[in-house]
Amino acid sequence: YTTAIEQLSSDKASIRLGGVYTLVGLVDEWLADDKTIPNIEERRKEGQVIINNLCAYIRSPFLLAERTKQLDAPYAKDLQKNFGGDIEKFNEDKQYFAQEKAALEEERQVRQSIIKEMREHLSKNYSKSGPWSDFDYDFSDAHFFYPVNFNDSYFGTSIVNFSGATFTQADF
């Protein structure tokens, strides 16, 4: 558990994703493990701790998100005039732009993976509720700079908090 939480703070997206999938697996294991923890409420409490961490990750600020519109656009060749014809400075800026664009996309993928896993555990292949339908989800003040899809999700007795959240793209 501790290692997976630490992975969420890695500068490498692949390691952060590994942490996400490890945590998702741990929630599922705890919910299913009625031998070690016979009481379902105790198992849910353990799972809720991980859900809280995943929601905290979603809520955490990501500075490049403020530049989503700019970074989603292609790098304009006409910006070369801003560098007084200095090709070297133009190329440096273009490379920096590409690095930031890649970092934004990687972070989108990590956050979208968390939302996708939540959605699948809330609905997919379940007639009413999914195994995560009774957890609480706190997305307050989150900035969703990526598509969010909770279609067909069943939150059961959950408290779901989106207060203060901003959405660039969402489908409920």
Region spans (language model):
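N-terminal capping/linker segments that flank leucine-rich repeat
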Residues: 1-137
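Tandem repeat scaffolds
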Residues: 128-172
